[in-house]
Amino acid sequence: MKQSILTLSLLSALALSSCQRDLDEVSPQSTPQPTESNSPSTPARTFLSTQGAEAGTLYIRIRRSAKNGFRALDAGGASMQSLPLQLAKSLRSIGTEYLEPLFPMDPRFEERIRREGLDLWYIVHFDKKQNLQSAMQTLSSVPEVEYTEPAYEIAQPTGKPVPVNYIGRSDAPAAPYNDPLLPDQWHYHNTGRFSRSIAGADIGLFEAWTKETGKANVIVAVDDGGIDIKHPDLKDNLYVNQAELKGKEGVDDDNNGFVDDIYGFNFIHNNGTIYPDDESHGTHVAGTVGARTNNNIGVAGVAGGDGTEGSGVRLMSCQIFGGKNEGGSGARAMYYSANNGAVISQNSWGYVLKANITAIPQADKAAIDYFIKYAGCDKDGNQLPNSPMKGGIVIFAAGNDGMDYKSYPGAYPPVVAVASMAPNWTAAYYSNRGDWVDITAPGGDTHFPQGEVLSTLSEKITGKEYGYMQGTSMACPHVSGVAALIVSHFGKKGFTNVECQQRLLGALKAQNIDALTGYKGRMGRGYIDASAVFAENKKKAPAKITQLHIDDVSFTTAHLSWLAVRDEDDGLPVEYNLYLSTEKITEANAKDALHTKLNATGYAPGKKITLPLNALHENTTYYLAIEAVDRWGLKSGLTLAQLTTKKNNPPVLTRSSEKKLRVSALTKESFSVTFSDPDQQKVSISVSGESRGVSYQISGDKILFSLRAVAPVGKYEITVTATDVLGAKTLLSIPFEVYTYKAPAFISSLGSHVVGIGQSTTLDVAPTLEKSDGVALTYKARVSDGSLASATINADGQLVIRGLKTGTTQVNLEVSDGISTPVQTSIPLRVVQNTSEPVYSVYPIPATTELNIVLNPATQRANIQIYSLTGVKVLDRDYTVGGIGKVKLLVKNLAPGAYTLRVQSAQGSYTKAFVKK
């Protein structure tokens, strides 16, 4: 049964998208029943990978409503023509040769088989040239078919056995039994006598044998290569179906649905002929579980008895591989063993790595669930009178890929998954790992002298009857053997698989598996200790943890620490449960919080245990609780704490200038954006939006931009995104425009102007110009005769002229956009004494032929008179002068002499003497 072990962090799951779910892929601890989904009843038509699958074979599960159409087929007396029309048509379309039930009906248990839906599973054998995915799609489209999956190839054993002679050694240490090779079975009792091995790196079997050696009423199904049924060290401990042994050949004498199944069954060829596989793998595995002990030959098995009659567990050979490319159904083998007395299912097999299986195949799931629920039971699920246990326990090797990944079927939560160790406590180099592994046992390591596992071999295959092999395949039967000791010792009416599994997974060596293997939380709870399975539950819970310390809290991480506690009756707890939630945790709601487990074995009471938490949310308050749990599931009670992570401030983006960005065919723009992070985190930069004509490079803490007019005329936007390592983002939008350029030009006159001394006038130059919209202009103003007036002009084109001395001059203007050649114009200027006077000037004096009178510009009409020195009026005339501002008098006919000029207008009266030459 799976437990989730906390590794170096609480994984990304601690992001707490929901606090109301489990971190663990685990079924409730009170039962080994499965929780993993991927149910065949799910309507979604998604298919498992077909890599590593057998060509021309599929498993299907039909709907219960369609079962009547298959009854004739089940009886073996009908062809596909008896099936529903559409199904028959689809089967023919893929070249189907025949169908057969995956789980042949056992009439003794028909009711429970139908209740669990195993009668709905069929194997479809069809043209091997057909594409498997297409065939699955074809069958899944049929209304009667509920689910379809490939039949995966079982990985063939690759390790080669190393045969040995079993001549007793004079230097062999004392052993409790007389099997000559027992002293060399270091995996049972390691004295450290082999080079680089460490004393105690074993399963503690010699001490366990003082309590139990195995009983014949315990049947262990060995789903593996065929066992050598003639092996002298195995033949007396084989399961024997007496009805078939004493019955007629070719007849199902015990009416269990299988013919001639004397020692088990061959699921490759579907007959009772058991033969050793090409590597003697099944024989080696069987020997570890239950080779006859104390019989003065060969080796001993974990639960092989003590040499007395009736001692030793019984080995049921469920052959699922044999020669090269030979494979049978592990699911069918498990189903068979559940119906025929086995209560422990030993499985040192898996699927090829290339199959890339990411979920338990549903046929395997159905068989495993069935074995766990019904092994040792009658048709109603009640314990059989002659069975030592109600329900079964399924044990799988973790696999030999040397990888950290979920290897199915072993990774299915309800089974016990076994990893492998070397003779010095380290993880065997080939062993798979993961938080789905439950426990570790010796599997051997060829890099150590005599460091592999010693067990039985088939002489027919290897030339010798004993030899070494390595693998999780060798570790797994140690655990199955220990489970067999548990059932042998405690088995009775009312003893359950839950109790067995609890004892099995709680029987651990004192060593710290996390520290010794280096794979924290990836090698299971610990190293199995056979001697610890007999401990008594005195109902005493572990001591409560005094305090949960929290240090080094950052935005997403924190460090936890606490002191290891003791357990009064068991010495140490087996694990610590850590709970995490954004809600306050209590004893009542702890089960709803995110939680995980940490191995407790190997941490002496008072030793400081530290644990980093990762993947927390920033600026969030978390509530934590921790408890110690012993092997019996008794808990210390919760110790509470809380923490609040630091607030993460987003990065800062700042533009070098806020001016509007405009580019044309003649212009480009350059600017920069500075980025920083208030929390001193690393910032990553991305630029999106318009890319035509936009180039940039990052230099230090600046993004240097250059804009050119590549995109069509229009308005565009660039977005700069700064992201810190925790994902906080800041976005800066930068608009820019592509426009058509127009050089500035004067399109109207500024006129001529008059200003009084000490007075000023203001002109708006900008409206007289034509230019490109949005282009800024610079202005310059200069008076030709600076003694007469001054001129200033601002950035908006407001020209201010101030009179200094009477006279006429001009103001010169220059306007530039910084792109084209500047444009110029001039403004005629007259400086008068006072601009409110009716006449600004009279000239020339003396006059000869004409006399010019410059009037106030506001004058519309004026009366002009000239008097001689004697007072004679020589001119009296009215002039309309609106808009002209000047009157020219012809005076050439006047006699030379002195005269007086008088001007009368709405602006006032004016008198001036002048001389006519």
Named regions from a protein language model:
Residues 108-123, 137-219, 227-233:
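Protease zymogen maturation seam
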Residues 225, 247, 255, 260-366, ...:
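Subtilisin-like peptidase catalytic core
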Residues 224, 407-488:
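Extracellular S/T/G-rich loop segment that most often corresponds to the catalytic His/Ser-adjacent loop
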Residues 5, 835-843, 847-917:
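C-terminal outer-membrane/trafficking sorting elements
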Residues 28-167:
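Inhibitory N-terminal propeptides of secreted protease zymogens
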Residues 143-146, 198-271, 284, 288, ...:
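Acidic-leg catalytic submotif of subtilisin-like serine proteases
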Residues 573-617:
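Recognizes extended acidic, P/S/T-rich segments that occur
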Residues 238, 342-347, 357, 390-392, ...:
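C-terminal subdomain of the subtilisin-like protease fold in secreted/lumenal serine endopeptidases
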